[in-house]
Structures are given as structure tokens and as C-alpha cells.
């Protein structure tokens, strides 16, 4: 009965979304409510493993009463929230993996508030600084970044004692890039991307920093990275081996598609044959690979970036969010919430502008998959709502900005956040009650890619359906009338389908100035016509 009552009360006091124009007093009241909701949830969820709940609730009530009497409680509330919320039992783990990378200095005139709307402008100082930080623009892959010149390392943070010095696990030699970590669900080893003066490669090390080995085995003119373990023992990763070019860059930048390989780097096979980039592969509990696909194929170029799934062998590819949508432009770094293959946390971002950073959102494909229909919550720490805007530079003016979310549970998350332009990227604890609490930051450095070091359930294994002795495939299209494309067209009117293909451009051979500005940016071919049954 007590458990039910606590849950009921926590639901009653969940903070609502605040209006766009708020005062500092509004924000304090909001954070009192969000903090109370989280404490009640931790008390309900963990009981004696969160022993100070009652004490914290009393202390929060005292702060609330002082605030009602006109006292300035901002500093006291900030300290209290950090103490109470970082005692979350989910943080009692062996540490948090993250990437520590030096941030480039940004000029004061760029950071001036009057330049906030244009600070992520094309070719601007902030844009160049983000690339120096190892963050390619939204329509580029790592191949567009400098291969050397990074001050970075894989480190381990103690979330219970964040003031302790972090342990350095691995530093790339010769100022190479190191990042894009994927921790195996047994928490004993990890994949990561490393660059040298020649190319980008996939490596693996054990959780103690030993046993480093290069996994990807490709020629020096092929880049590899963004790797993810799969439960069948293979690895899915991004590579420029297709030798395609990004059409919006007029053929100047390389495309990264997804490939699969064995654990020793052999047996490389292309599994995504897309016009543009495939990013951020991660595993769903049901055994499917979740990834982000960039599309330009004869559609509204600024707005189509689908979330996709496929089987580990590359079959069964389909969009699960964003097909035919104008909002959001992009959903980067998607990860499934524990135990669910429909609930996903991701970064909502734009087309041009801020590099893959943006709003922290939770989506549920069972709630919807079109525009804002499945976006169930935005987490900002200050009550900001999801606003379905159809806009190119969608999130440039939004603060705070987020990267690399990783769920601790279905309610609590680690995430990298940049609260304001003059700050640093730090590691934060976020929750569904809209709290955002700093775990660790280091002035002058960015702390990115937080991953809790703990064992996770192994995803399901989906048997391979690929017969490599054959060079044909079967495509199932069970209802051409489904979806908005043929809305209002009576059944049995369509008699046949025309099948055509894109010939994706090699470097220097794609782009709007070569084929068409508003239509396809590459050559297309009609393959034939097939009758409908």
C-alpha cells in the first residue's frame, strides 16, 4: 500500500512543461517539483537501497518554505539536488566510460549573446571548432575530419565520487582521434574508432585497457568506424568502402555505409546500400540493429533522416520513425531503453547547423512514427516542450545542447550536455522527471560518450537468412495502397509498378549542379515494369 501511494503521489507532482517565457522563480519552483518527483521515485523503486529519501524530502520541504518566504535558495537547491539525486543506486557501478577531449577555444565575439542565432553558421568559427572537437557536421562522416591533432583519451569516471581523478584507460598515439565507443554487454571489452595519419580504423581493448588489437582490415584509402557488437558474434560498422560521395557536398565528401565483419575483421560484407550516410548502429533487445539513415533520394532534401532497423545479416530493413515526415529533421545517437525495442532515447537535431547535437528526447514507436506523434517527452532540465517546427537549422538557438545519451534504466540516463556557449561539455544525470544534474566537467575539455560499466542483457539472436551463393533477393511489398502516397486512389486502379534505381555518385560525380537542383541529385535508371497481383 505504501509503495502504491508513493507512486501515486509522484505522478501527481510530476512537473508540467513550462511556458517559453519564464522567470527565475518559475524555474526554482519547477526544479523543486522535479526533484521531489525523482526522490519519491527512487524511494519507491529502491526502498532501503536509497536510505536517505525521507531526510531529503524533509530538507526539500524546508528549502521550499524558505523560498516561499522570499529567501534566495538557488545555490542551496543546486547543492541539495546534486547530493540527493547522485545517490541514485543505478550509479553504484564499476565506473562510467567516457571520452575526454580538449575543447578548442572560441573567440569572445562568437560567444556574445547577440551572435547566438548565427554562431553555428556555415563555415563559422564555432563550426570549425566543433570539427576540431571531433564532431563532423550532420552531412559528413569522420572522413571529413582531421585525422590527427587531438588531445583525447578513453577515461573512467567514478560517478559516486566524481571529484576523484579519472582513470585513463587508453590514449591514441600520435595525437590521433579516439572515440565512438561500444561496450560489449558483458562489460569486459569495447570497440572504438581510432585515426592515424593514413585512415580511420576499428579497434578493440579489454575493460582494463589491455589486449588492444586492430579489428578492421581494409586498404589505407578506406575509413572504418562507428562499430557495434552483434549477438551473432559479428560486428556492424560504418565504412567508406563504397567509394560514394555526398551529393549535397557536390561530390567532395565521402559516404559511410554500414558493413558487417567477423570478430577478427574477416568476411567484410556490405549490408546497407544507401545513397548517403548510415550512422550510430546499436542493438535493440529483440536482436535487430537500430541505425540512422540519411536520405536524399529525390525528396525534400532537408527533412528526411529516418530511424531504421535491420537484422544483423542486413535483411529486413525498414523505417521505424520518420518516413514521410517533415519533423524532426534528424534523430541522432538512438539507443533503446532497457527491455524495450520500441522506446528509444535520441538527440533531435536539424539539417545544417549544430553538429549532431540538439534536444534530448524519448520516443515510442508504439505511440507513433510520423513527425511528433511518437515523441513522448523532451528532457531539458527546465521544462521545455517539444515544438514541431519545420525548419532547416532546427536547434541552433536551443540550449542546453546534448550528445550521446545512454540509459541507466527506463527513467534515468547519462548524457553529455553543453549548457551554454561559454561552458564546457560535461557528463550529466538526466531523468524523466526533467532533472539535469552535473556529474563531472573539466574546464577546457569536453567529456563525451558516457557509458555505464555494467553488464546488460544479451540481445536476442536472429538467425541469418542470407544465402551468399545467390546473387538475387526477394523484396516483399504487400500493399501498394498503404501509406499517404496513394491516398484517395481506389483499389484495383493501379495495374503495374515501374522499378527504377539510382546510380550513386563516385567522388566528384554527384551533386545538385550535375543532375538537378530540386529533384534527384544523381542519375537514375528505369529497370522495368512489373504487374500488380
Which stretches of residues belong to each language-model region?
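Beta-propeller blade signature
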Residues: 152-159, 203-208, 253-264, 304-315, ...
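Residue-level detector of Asp-centered blade-edge/turn motifs that repeat once per structural unit
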Residues: 91-92, 185-186, 230-232, 284-286, ...
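Multi-bladed beta-propeller domains
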Residues: 162-176, 206-223, 262-276, 311-330, ...
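Long amphipathic alpha-helical scaffold segments
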Residues: 47-141, 145-168, 508
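Short, conserved, GDST-rich strand-edge loop motifs in beta-rich repeat architectures
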Residues: 101-149, 195, 237-254, 291-305, ...
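Loop/turn-rich, solvent-exposed surfaces of beta-rich toroidal or solenoidal domains
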Residues: 337-428
Amino acid at each position: 500500500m505504501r509503495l502504491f501511494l508513493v507512486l501515486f503521489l509522484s505522478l501527481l507532482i510530476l512537473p508540467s512543461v513550462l511556458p517559453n517565457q519564464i522567470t527565475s522563480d518559475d524555474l526554482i519552483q519547477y526544479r523543486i517539483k522535479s526533484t521531489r518527483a525523482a526522490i519519491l521515485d527512487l524511494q519507491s523503486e529502491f526502498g532501503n537501497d536509497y536510505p536517505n529519501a525521507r531526510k531529503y524530502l524533509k530538507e526539500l520541504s524546508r528549502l521550499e518554505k524558505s523560498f516561499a518566504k522570499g529567501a534566495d535558495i538557488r545555490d542551496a537547491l543546486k547543492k541539495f539536488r546534486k547530493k540527493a539525486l547522485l545517490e541514485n543506486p543505478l550509479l553504484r557501478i564499476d565506473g562510467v566510460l567516457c571520452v575526454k577531449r580538449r575543447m578548442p577555444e572560441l573567440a569572445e565575439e562568437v560567444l556574445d549573446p547577440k551572435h547566438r542565432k548565427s554562431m553555428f553558421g556555415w563555415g563559422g568559427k564555432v563550426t570549425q571548432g566543433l570539427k576540431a572537437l571531433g564532431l563532423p557536421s550532420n552531412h559528413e562522416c569522420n572522413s571529413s575530419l582531421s585525422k590527427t591533432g587531438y588531445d583525447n583519451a578513453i577515461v573512467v569516471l567514478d560517478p559516486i565520487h566524481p571529484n576523484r581523478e579519472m582513470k585513463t584507460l587508453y590514449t591514441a598515439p600520435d595525437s590521433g582521434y579516439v572515440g565512438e565507443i561500444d561496450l560489449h554487454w558483458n562489460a569486459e571489452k569495447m570497440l572504438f574508432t581510432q585515426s592515424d595519419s593514413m585512415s580511420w580504423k576499428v579497434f578493440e581493448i579489454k575493460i582494463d585497457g589491455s589486449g588492444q588489437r586492430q579489428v578492421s582490415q581494409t586498404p589505407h584509402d578506406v575509413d572504418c568506424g562507428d562499430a557495434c557488437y552483434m549477438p551473432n558474434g559479428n560486428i556492424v560498422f560504418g565504412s567508406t568502402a563504397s567509394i560514394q560521395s555526398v551529393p549535397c557536398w557536390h561530390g567532395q565528401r565521402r559516404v559511410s555505409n554500414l558493413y558487417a565483419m567477423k570478430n577478427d575483421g574477416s568476411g567484410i560484407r556490405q549490408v546497407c546500400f544507401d545513397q548517403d550516410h548510415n550512422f550510430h548502429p546499436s542493438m535493440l533487445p529483440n536482436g535487430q540493429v537500430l541505425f540512422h539513415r540519411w536520405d536524399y533520394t529525390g525528396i525534400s532534401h532537408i527533412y528526411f533522416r529516418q530511424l531504421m532497423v535491420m537484422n544483423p545479416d542486413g535483411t529486413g530493413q525498414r523505417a521505424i520513425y520518420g518516413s514521410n515526415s517533415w519533423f524532426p529533421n534528424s534523430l541522432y545517437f538512438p539507443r533503446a531503453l532497457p527491455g524495450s525495442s520500441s522506446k528509444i532515447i535520441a538527440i533531435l537535431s536539424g539539417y545544417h547547423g549544430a553538429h549532431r547535437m540538439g534536444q534530448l528526447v524519448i520516443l515510442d514507436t508504439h505511440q507513433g512514427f510520423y513527425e511528433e506523434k511518437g515523441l513522448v517527452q523532451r528532457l531539458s532540465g527546465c521544462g521545455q516542450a517539444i515544438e514541431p517546427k519545420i525548419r532547416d537549422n532546427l536547434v541552433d538557438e536551443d540550449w542546453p545542447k546534448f550528445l550521446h545519451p545512454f540509459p541507466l534504466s527506463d527513467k534515468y540516463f547519462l548524457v553529455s550536455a553543453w549548457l551554454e556557449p561559454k561552458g564546457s561539455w560535461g557528463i550529466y544525470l538526466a531523468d524523466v522527471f526533467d532533472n539535469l544534474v552535473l556529474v563531472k566537467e573539466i574546464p577546457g575539455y569536453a567529456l563525451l560518450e558516457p557509458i555505464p560499466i555494467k553488464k546488460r542483457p544479451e540481445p536476442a539472436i536472429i538467425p541469418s537468412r542470407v544465402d551468399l551463393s545467390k546473387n538475387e533477393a526477394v523484396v516483399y511489398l504487400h500493399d501498394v495502397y498503404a501509406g499517404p502516397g496513394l491516398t484517395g486512389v481506389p483499389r484495383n486502379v493501379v495495374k503495374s509498378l515501374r522499378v527504377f534505381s539510382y546510380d550513386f555518385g563516385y567522388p566528384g560525380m554527384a551533386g545538385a549542379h550535375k543532375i538537378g537542383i530540386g529533384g534527384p541529385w544523381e542519375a537514375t535508371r528505369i529497370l522495368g515494369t512489373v504487374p500488380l497481383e
